[in-house]
Amino acid sequence: MDHSLDVVRRDAGARSFETKEWRVDLKKFVAPALAALLLVGTMAFAGCSAEEELASEAESSAEEATEELEGSITVQGSDTLLNVATAWSESFMDENPGVDISVQGGGSGTGIAALINGTVDFANSSRGIKDEEITEAESKGMDIVEHSVAIDGIAVVVNPANGVSDLSLDELGKIFRGEITNWKDVGGVDAEIVLLSRDSSSGTYEFFKETVVGDDLEYAASAKLLPSNQAIADEVAANEAGIGYIGLGYVTPDVKVVAVDGVVASVETAADGSYPISRYLYMYSDGEPEGVMAAYLDWILGAEGQQLVEDEGFVPLP
C-alpha cells in the first residue's frame, strides 16, 4: 500500500522589509527556511499517519479473524481418535475463544451414521466409509468428503507374563476366528486363549476383520466384545491368557505388544508401512468444510494439530 500523503502547500509570496537606507527582500531568506520546516512537518505527519493506518489495518484484520472463527462444531465417532480429537478441540478452543467444539466417541459407525442423519458436522472414523453408507448419504442429497488426519498401527497386545512375542498374520487370523484356541499351539503355555475384541460399531473392529480375520469370515463366537481401546487394554493387563488389539495411542507398559510377521507396531513401522496392520484415520464431512469448520480442519492438518497427533502416540501425516 502506498502510504505517501499529498500535502497542500500555500505559497505566502515575496515579503519585503524597507528602511530609509536599504530594502531587504525577505523572500530569499525566509523561503528556504519555510521549505525546510514544511518538509520536516510533512515527513513527521506522513510517518505518524502511516503508523496509525497500519495499526488500524492490523486491528481490523484481528477483528475480522475473530469474526471468522466464531461458531460451533460437533464431532462424533471413532474411539481410537477420541483422545487426539479431544486434544485438538481443547487446544483450538484455547486459541479461539469464540469457537465451541463438542467431541463424542461411540465408534466410527456411530459417527458416520450421525453425519448422514445431519446431527454432527464431522464424523471421526478409523476405517474408510462403506459403499452402502455413501449410497445412503447420496440418497439424502449429501456429498461426503473424506479427510485423512493421522496414521495408526493396530497393536496386538497380550499380558506381559505371556511368553509369546511374535505371531504371523495367518496365526493371528486363526486365533481370532477361533481355529487356534490354546496358547501352546503358537509357542505359549498350555492355556485357553481369551479373545478380546472391539464391538461391531468400531472402525477398528471393521479394519481388523478385513485385514486379519478375513473380510468374508467372522470373529470367533467366544470373542468378548468391548466398547473401547482402553477397555481392551485393561482386560489384557488383568488376564494372562488374554489377547486383544488397540490403537497405538493406547499402548502402555501394562500390556505387551506382540510382533506381527516379525514387525512390532510402532510410530516408525506404521509411518513407513512395514507394519502389516497400519491404517489412516479420517474425518468425514458433508461437502468441503467452510468457515469455522474449514479453519479447524486446516489447523488439524497443520503443524500444531499434527504435533498433537504425535503427542497422543499416533503418527503424523507425511
Question: Where do the model's predicted regions map?
Answer:
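Residues at the start of alpha-helices and the adjacent loop-to-helix junctions
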Residues: 6, 27-28, 77, 103
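Enrichment for repetitive, rod-forming helical segments
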Residues: 17, 34-35
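Bacterial N-terminal signal peptides that target proteins for export
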Residues: 25-34
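Exported/periplasmic ABC-transporter solute-binding proteins
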Residues: 49-318
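Bacterial N-terminal signal peptides
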Residues: 35-42
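C-terminal motif of bacterial Sec signal peptides marking the signal peptidase cleavage site
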Residues: 44-47
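Short, Lys/Arg-enriched N-terminal segments with co-localized hydrophobic residues
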Residues: 2-25
